[in-house]
Amino acid sequence: MLKLLLGDPNTRKLKRYQPIVEEINFLEEEISKLTDDELRQETHNLKSQISSESDIKQQKELLDESLPKAFAIVREASKRVLDMRHFDVQLIGGMVLHECQIAEMKTGEGKTLVATLPCYLNALTGKGVHVVTVNDYLARRDAEWMGQVHRFLGLSVGLIQQDMSPVQRKKNYDCDITYATNSELGFDYLRDNMSTDINEVVQRPFNYCVIDEVDSILIDEARTPLIISGQVERPQEKYQKASELALALVKAKEIGKDGIDPEGDYEVDEKQRSCILTDQGFAKCEEYLAVSDLYNPKDPWAHYITNALKAKELFIKDVNYIIKNNEAVIVDEFTGRVMPGRRWSDGQHQAIEAKESLKIQPETQTLASITYQNFFLLYPGLAGMTGTAKTEEVEFEKTYKLESTVIPTNQIRKREDLPDQVFKTEIGKWKAVARETAQIHRAGRPVLVGTTSVEKSELLSSLLAEEKIPHNLLNAKPENVEREAEIVAQAGRAGAVTIATNMAGRGTDIILGGNSDYMARLKLKEILIPLLVKPNNEHKPPIPKQRSSKSKGGFSSKVGSNLTKNIPDYSTSLFPCKLDEEIQKKLSVLSDELVKNWGDRQLSVLDLDDRIATAAEKAPTEDKMIKLLRESLSRVKDEYEKVLTHEEKKVREVGGLHVIGTERHESRRVDNQLRGRAGRQGDFGSTRFFLSLEDNLLRIFGGERVANLMNAFRVDEDMPIESGMLTRSLESAQKKVETYYYDIRKQVFEYDEVMNNQRKAVYSERLRVLQGTDLKRQVIGYGERTMYEIVEAYINPDLPPEEWDIAQLISKVKEFIYLLDDLKADDVKLLSIEELKNYLQEQLRTAYDLKESQIEQIRPGLMREAERFFILQQIDNLWREHLQSMDSLRESVGLRGYGQKDPLIEYKNEGYDMFLEMMTNMRRNVIYSMFMFQPKTDKDDKN
């Protein structure tokens, strides 16, 4: 009703931007007359004007005033460098981002290009801008591709990659605009706050940040905190024994109700992802291990057994993890990518290693941690882009104070979303998927099939191989990951079939007919790798292995001949045609030149990738080799383009890309992302989901209602079921899951909020120490506070002065400050409490000056170094112990709910007390260490 009366709030919001769009369009003609150098000068003038304003509010107003001109400059630069002009809707997207909101833009609407607008504008402050992507490949692609626009305008562009040294990182963070992944940014922040020298700190204070695929980072990954950990030795045989025991235990067929244990040794709750021993199971374990109590603190077993049971029942090989180089590597459930270097905590990873008979790595202890939620809230300006934000609008608003605005598409969507097909059994569903894939493939349309795990993608792969359908597989297996971009680049070719796990290639558009730019790069890579790359540099050839060797170009032979008559017989599985002799000769000359200049097999694969990517740019270059490479790339691309343009036309005629979903994801948003692959930028396309009543989502969250439906449907397994009740069950299951995970994220956020305030206090204290501004005053401050606390502890103001325990107080003071050895009770017994505090603080300052003169005689500057060392040492040690204590508190506090107490309030109160105690200990330990500090001198060494 309100919508009818007031109109759609999103539409009202968009109208507000229209006059600014008109102003930018008006400026376009004026800006287009400027030379390249004049454009750069405009940037310089704007930057000088904005960065010189020290008042933050005034600076923000200046930025807003400069927006039309800045956007017009970026649009012009983009036309000149990328041959891409921002549409009006993209300008609106840029304004939404500048206002620190989330811009929801459909797949293929050019989100990456939109980001150039607010990034350029906010970089004019000179405080740095971060562009965040979900993986290293996308960060590099965007820094190379969009970075051209910024470099052309005279701004510096940085890129953070996994294997960079601290020096390289610092240099890149100091650039005007820096591209990085969320995990690199987060870990650098934690490492900076563990460094012992200000020169080791790589990041500047945060300013403005744009997150690409914001839903993936702020929502999907919000449940997992970033943790830096150190190793702790734990007995490995316990993991092995627990793993053997888990195999011997019998799972209960159902979950116990009303406190009554079911038949079996343990029950599994898939929804809560937990395993609980029954009384019978406890007895069996105690007998097997010959112990009387699994929870005995001196010899605990319960934790090991629970982890072993979870490894057996809930952590499935090729779904949750894969085995690579004799290590268990985690697979991200949202992107389907492997996450090397990441490990499950609390001994869970070790339990999986024991289950798979791998070498068990030592357990770890947390040294520093932060959640993505609290990390990104450190940015004064935060904005994000995604194709799907509306489903999580409330969470963005509540947790991050971020509004979502839907940006209209530039062209009308022509995608057809076909009704779901639901099957009784999983095998019936997979057969139907294979049938539909074969049918669409034979019609000459490209097909993209999204699966939820490595295991399922390989099952479908084998079904298609039986049907002799050539296809590409894109999942977390190492041999497929390397070819991610290559596979997606050709996924739009006629009849191509691509199976992808959770659309791992998000970020690379599927272009109907195939992506000539990527194919040209790959052709050059194929020629140059054997000549330029070091032989020991591990690399798989980038040529996708089609599953059917007889077919050409990803088509069945019949389709290949019908659709692509102009493609010669000798086309390979990736490249659309053979290059003519003239181009081949040129490539041969190029190879010889590059070997002469870059050396025979001297580069790494990454180096070569970078150089080919630079050559693919349009940015000006003086490098002769890059120019040669660019010319060859252009020739190869033009050659491929001729064939692919014809192919694109054919693909459009038969209906465009068809996307098949094989399971509803836990989040409707991920389903929408998969659908969004078809029908980009007004292309034709279609989507359909195939589901079964045995799918995880319905099985775990659908409840008894779905189980009853299964029995009610007396239909064959390969007969699709259509039922309104079923569709409603499905939607309610999905909403249930979304609410369930939202509650988990909310809880993670609320608990981490307590840690966050403590973390900020500790990290700002550390930074003060690293910057070294007046360390002496800081340490004396610690000492004065300690003297104050000693007086408060030993003097009771309610007692008369003659009953005060002055002797005990003086003894305590001397424990901390041995230089006050001649201090006597008689010196202070006539003083009031305030006078006593002032007197002791005065004595402390005098003693500290004396200590300083002793130390400085040994070596000037040594006292400041000692102060820095002891403060950092104490902060780090006590913070590490505090993190451990807070973890234990969090685990135990949940039980207080049974005593009618709010666990979160209890956690806040006790956590605060523990934090105050930690800070007190830190101050006292520093004072004690400083006075006890006795450096060795040359005389000591001679003696």
Curated annotation (Swiss-Prot):
Broad EC category: translocase
InterPro entries registered for this protein in UniProt: Helicase_ATP-bd, P-loop_NTPase, SecA, SecA_CS, SecA_DEAD, SecA_motor_DEAD, SecA_preprotein_X-link_dom, SecA_SF2_C
Pfam families membership: P-loop_SecA (PF21090), SecA_DEAD (PF07517), SecA_PP_bind (PF01043), SecA_SW (PF07516)
UniProt superkingdom: Bacteria
Catalytic activity: ATP + H2O + cellular proteinSide 1 = ADP + phosphate + cellular proteinSide 2
Region listing for Disordered, in residue ranges: 535-560
Keyword Cell inner membrane: yes
Subcellular location: Cell inner membrane; Cellular thylakoid membrane; Cytoplasm
Entry's Gene Ontology molecular function annotations: ATP binding; protein-exporting ATPase activity
Membrane disposition: Peripheral membrane protein
GO biological processes: intracellular protein transmembrane transport; protein import; protein targeting; protein transport by the Sec complex
Matching SMART domains: SecA_DEAD, SecA_PP_bind
Cellular component aspect of the GO annotation: cell envelope Sec protein transport complex; cytosol; plasma membrane-derived thylakoid membrane
Biased composition (Low complexity): 551-560
Keywords: ATP-binding, Cell inner membrane, Cell membrane, Cytoplasm, Membrane, Nucleotide-binding, Protein transport, Thylakoid, Translocase, Translocation, Transport
Record's signal peptide: none
Binding site for ATP: Q90, G108, E109, G110, K111, T112, D509
Entry EC number(s): 7.4.2.8
Family, similarity comment: Belongs to the SecA family.
Subunit structure and binding partners: Monomer and homodimer. Part of the essential Sec protein translocation apparatus which comprises SecA, SecYEG and auxiliary proteins SecDF. Other proteins may also be involved.
Role according to the record: Part of the Sec protein translocase complex. Interacts with the SecYEG preprotein conducting channel. Has a central role in coupling the hydrolysis of ATP to the transfer of proteins into and across the cell membrane, serving as an ATP-driven molecular motor driving the stepwise translocation of polypeptide chains across the membrane.
Protein name (record): Protein translocase subunit SecA
Source species of the chain: Prochlorococcus marinus (strain MIT 9312)
Organism taxonomic ancestry: Bacteria, Bacillati, Cyanobacteriota, Cyanophyceae, Synechococcales
Gene coding for it: secA
